[in-house]
Amino acid sequence: MSQNPPELRPDIAPGIKIDPAARPGQPTIGMVSLGCPKALVDSERILTRLRAEGYAISPDYAGAEAVIVNTCGFLDSAKAESLEAIGEALSENGRVIVTGCLGAEPEYITGHHPSVLAVTGPHQYEQVLDAVHAAVPPSPDPFVDLLPASGVSLTPRHYSYLKISEGCNHKCKFCIIPDMRGRLASRPAHAVVREAEKLVEAGVRELLVISQDTSAYGVDIRHAEDRGHRAHITDLARDLGGLGAWVRLHYVYPYPHVRDLIPLMAEGLVLPYLDIPFQHAHPDTLRRMARPAAAEKTLDRIAEWRAICPEITLRSTFIVGYPGETEAEFQTLLDWMDEAQLDRVGCFQYENVAGARSNALPDHVAPEVKQDRWERFMAKAQAISAAKLAAKVGSRIEVIVDEVDAEAATCRTKADAPEIDGNLFIDAGFEGLAPGDIVTVDVDEASDYDLWGTRV
């Protein structure tokens, strides 16, 4: 899904003033950012570098001298969306530079769109800048000192993604991320903390920690300590928790040491929220995926986490219809869901991905069976969500305001990440609220995925 489709409306960080009508002689660039939050961070870094070099960011195709399309290539459906976005940019603008995960397959892109100016792979920032320089030469800008230390942001001003590493060391058979983005490469802890400090100083109220494998952070650099900060996820979470913003952890692989994070949640240093992709529950399915196969131990860990921090919210994603998945294996997943009682759940129907080892597995599941299992799984997840939210009616909770219009304030609880989880709506007494405000509400009503409340 495009993060700013298709009219190119990046939300600029606090303190930066960019007129869509560039000054005479000022080079202009547009950006379309597709895919996951990790790709969005790449887009922000590219735009920050370009602004520092004097480029203006165009809010539309017509005002841009060239357009960068940051693509997703994880699934065939994502590839199709990326090709469509490239085609639209070529049609509307004509001068297009392609980067991102699909850029790891340049022949695939140029085979469909031979007129693109350049193709670069994921997180190849210097190559993207070189391509921009060739297409739209830079011009010195005496106003670059107006660029805030936090850089250019494509998210609302009050929250920001904080990427702590690139790549992944796992070899899940359905995934090609290691082929596209390489092995785990952790950022130095002091650099992560300094970036977080700048974001908080610029007004960010919520830091969303992301990577491909957040719980493996620092393994590749042997948990090195530098300038008082150690590259280990527990230490990093503690450091970030001291900055005064909400800290939310995403993409946490279910290692045993994840337990060490839970006391930090109970203490209020980081949000009581874990995004852990379990993928399945049947041991045979997990082995075919090349994933950890101890589903019973996972249930024990979940119970332990809840004992330490009863308020913890658990989000996960699953794949149904994986090659070889039998009805009995799928039923095991449904039974596991009954026991696990996860708060937030996403589910995908398996699809082949070019280059994935799972493509060669026997006994692929028929499309109509995958659809049926997906519907049954989501019905189960929806019922669990509805019951859990209904239990919140009558409680008093803190929320962060995301948006305010004439009818309501759209907020999120500590249990809800932006874009992927639900909302809490305040439809009376919300006058004077602004995005980024953190307020207390009494929960009055619940639906399957959302809440309604009254400001205290």
From Swiss-Prot:
GO-annotated molecular function: 4 iron, 4 sulfur cluster binding; aspartic acid methylthiotransferase activity; metal ion binding; protein methylthiotransferase activity
Any Gene Ontology CC annotation: cytosol
EC id: 2.8.4.4
Free-text cofactor note: Binds 2 [4Fe-4S] clusters. One cluster is coordinated with 3 cysteines and an exchangeable S-adenosyl-L-methionine.
Cross-referenced InterPro entries: Elp3/MiaA/NifB-like_rSAM, Methylthiotransferase, Methylthiotransferase_N, Methylthiotransferase_N_sf, NA-bd_OB-fold, Ribosomal_uS12_MeSTrfase_RimO, rSAM, rSAM_horseshoe
Taxonomic source organism: Dinoroseobacter shibae (strain DSM 16493 / NCIMB 14021 / DFL 12)
PROSITE patterns: MTTASE_N (PS51449), RADICAL_SAM (PS51918), TRAM (PS50926)
Binding site for [4Fe-4S] cluster 2: C168, C172, C175
Ranges for domain TRAM: 390-456
Family membership noted in the UniProt record: Belongs to the methylthiotransferase family. RimO subfamily.
Cofactor: [4Fe-4S] cluster
CDD domains the record matches: Radical_SAM
Cited function: Catalyzes the methylthiolation of an aspartic acid residue of ribosomal protein uS12.
Domain MTTase N-terminal: residue ranges: 27-137
Protein name according to UniProt: Ribosomal protein uS12 methylthiotransferase RimO
Domain Radical SAM core: 154-387
UniProt KW keywords: 4Fe-4S, Cytoplasm, Iron, Iron-sulfur, Metal-binding, S-adenosyl-L-methionine, Transferase
Main location: cytoplasm
Catalytic activity field: L-aspartate(89)-[ribosomal protein uS12]-hydrogen + (sulfur carrier)-SH + AH2 + 2 S-adenosyl-L-methionine = 3-methylsulfanyl-L-aspartate(89)-[ribosomal protein uS12]-hydrogen + (sulfur carrier)-H + 5'-deoxyadenosine + L-methionine + A + S-adenosyl-L-homocysteine + 2 H(+)
One GO BP annotation of this record: tRNA modification
PANTHER family from the UniProt entry: RIBOSOMAL PROTEIN S12 METHYLTHIOTRANSFERASE RIMO, RIBOSOMAL PROTEIN US12 METHYLTHIOTRANSFERASE RIMO
Pfam families xrefs: Radical_SAM, TRAM_2, UPF0004
Subcellular localization, as worded in the UniProt entry: Cytoplasm
EC category name: transferase
Residues binding [4Fe-4S] cluster 1: C36, C72, C101
